[in-house]
Amino acid sequence: MHTKNVGTPVQRLEDDRLLRGKGRYVDDIDLPDQLAMMFVRSSEAHALIKSVDCDQARALHGVIGVYELKDFGALADKPMILANPSPLIRQPITQYMLALDEVCYVGQAIAVVVAENRYIAEDAAQLVVVDYEPLPVVMDARQAAMTNAHLVHQNSPDNLAATVPWKFGDIDQAFAKAPHIFKESYYQHRGVVHSMECRGVIAQYDAQLDQLTVWTSTQSPYLVRRFLAQFLEREEVAIRVIAPDVGGGFGPKAAHYPEELVATLLAIKLKRPIKWIEDRLEHFLTTTQQRDQWWDVEVACESDGHVLGMRAVCTHDNGAYLPYGLLLCMTSVAPFPGSYAIGAIDIRLDCMFTNAVPTTPIRGAGRPNATFVIERTMDTIARELKLDRVKVRQRNFVQKEQFPYLTGAKLPNGIGIQYDSGDYARCLDMVLEESQYSQLEIRCKEAAQKGIYRGIGIASYNEDSGLPPYEGATVKVLPSGKVYVELGSCSQGQGLETIAAQIAADQFGLHAGDILVKLGDTISSAMALSTVGSRVASTAGPSIFLAAQAVRQKAFKLAAEHFNVSENEVNINAGVLFLKSMPDKKISLADLAKKLVAGVMVNVPQGFSPGLESTAYHTTERAVYANGSNVAEVEVDIQTGEVTLLNYWVAHDCGTVINPALVNGQIIGGVVHAVGNALFEHMKFDQDTGQPITTNLGEYLLPLATEMPKIHITHMESPSPLNPLGVKGAGEGGTIPGIACLISAIEDALKPFHVKINEYPLSPEKLLCLIEEAKIRTVA
């Protein structure tokens, strides 16, 4: 009998094709008669456009046309569609596909050049002359919130996009009876995410069929189709969106962008395919960015560290526009109270416009921000009350017997936040055991005696993964006998093709490699939302399971009729159905599938629908909560400010583990992302002019493989009761607690200097400044 696929480290099915250079990314696609487009982008962070002179560009040989917003007729009056609208939004400002009369960040598109090839298009774009009337810039969200602040949009009353409240419990009572109240402020940087593949789009229009086909490097083909249809006022069935191989997503590719819309309109206008590939500089200037928030926090607690309540004000920098609604803001407040049973929370998040690139969710969305605040606050309590950091966390955890646990908070749709399953205390114990935490403390003390500054960091988290409501899947047996899985979801390197095959294969007694998988094509796949928020394994995964189960049941019923027996007498292995009592009596899936394909004078058996196939949608109104705890060991050189990462341990609970190797890969990648956020990545702007400063990979630093510690991973499985596989998300679990854990370790290493670290990233220069400031305070 075939061994089960789910739960085993099946080698990635994608790798053979991708490693041999057989992948098919957007830039690998070239269509007959294709044109290239390039954008003329704003060199000012805030200005009025007085004039745009395109004459020289239009005169260049090989240029097909140069277009401004006014050249698109009635559509010029329409701004981009707002994703995720909310009644909390005061100013639903989205950008026009090309600037109307005002630019609000460096890199905003003003005009577009279409030419016979990219080289000509780039040269022509350089010939377009834009005359600006500069306006004051606002680059700091806190300054944007001031009553006398300059305006990011000249016709707006102020810079406040929205205010998001998040509260439950009696916060006044919690603070009134608390013997201890501590206050802290935290700053979290703005960063960029650098997928190996930048964005790109190709649009083709078939005038005879009135059909649009769009290839785009996206995490959300169905959402792109929806927004294109809404903007163009076309039926969705007249638009096909394909996500081919996508070289990394991490969140920014979940949004829809002006470039997709402009390419589509030009393809219709010119009746020729249009291609645009983003270069790395454009990526720095235009692709949505991450994380930029200021927090002022108060915590009320008892003398033993038990937290009674937390209140906070967050000032969130959303950049110049609001393309993705309040999703990033909501995911910054909704994680509270984290892994802890805290009875009262009161948070206000002010979402501010600034003259910077818009921000949207990036790996973890707002959860790393919230977890940083929560975990640093736990460290503050331990430090101020001279308590053990571990005991403070254990004292406040939601306990195993409390699941399912209602926090008291409610989503905007009125559904209460409920943690479905887990054992947070055990997960922390596991990582302490794996890291030999008590021995780590001894090692740090011994190192200190030699003048070596080592520290240990701790952080715990939980994560709402598998976001509702659905992700569809179709499973069918082809007449050849091959099992075929179609998903509207698409992969950006997570290994979705592999886990889809593993789940389906188990229903037919096959190896994962026997399954064909197709992803991310709106013309043939079941409806889908997006590959975001660690959601596909716990939404599409159960849908694959349910669809495969339905196909299996249909095959059993048909085989039972074929053998003239009851269904419970039939079994399956290696794609062959047989009688349990007489294994030699058998019929293949191929033969069964052929029975359900009608032909001339050939009918489908009575009582059966055509095709050995099924489409399923696992639907849910609640997220499933993954969780974990991390420990980091670091060494700090107080002469240079350099931080060396010695070891990193992860205990992780994502419910049923479909593929341990893939989960480990996701965790390792997530930790690397956290290292980048904590120590290296910082998108800097000139505060007076709004000009971006770190616009290449020599100035904007990413972590290298040589800077990575050994990452030790252990799994705890507490299956979720909310889906038939028991799975939870894993894609962001390395990043969400990682930043807090690393900063905690660095602060611990610098205990002799009484350094307090409430911000990131920690460059060597910043760390040296903190050490010197602490020394001065000590002397004073």
Locate the predicted segments by residue.
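Short Pro/Gly-enriched beta-strand edge/turn motifs at strand-loop
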Residues: A83-P85, A176-G191, W276-H283, G451-S460, ...
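Glycine-rich loop/linker segments at domain edges
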Residues: T8, E14-R17, S86-R90, D158-V201, ...
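Thiamine diphosphate
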Residues: G249-K271, K275-I277, L496-A504
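Extended active-site and interfacial segments that coordinate phosphate-rich ligands
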Residues: D16-R17, Q126-L135, M139, Q219-P221, ...
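Conserved beta-alpha junction segments in alpha/beta enzyme cores
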Residues: I171-L232, M330, A334, G455-L487, ...
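Short acidic, glycine/serine/threonine-rich loops at helix termini
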Residues: A76-I81, A124-L127, R225-F227, F250-H256, ...
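Flexible, low-hydrophobicity surface segments
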Residues: M1-D158, K269
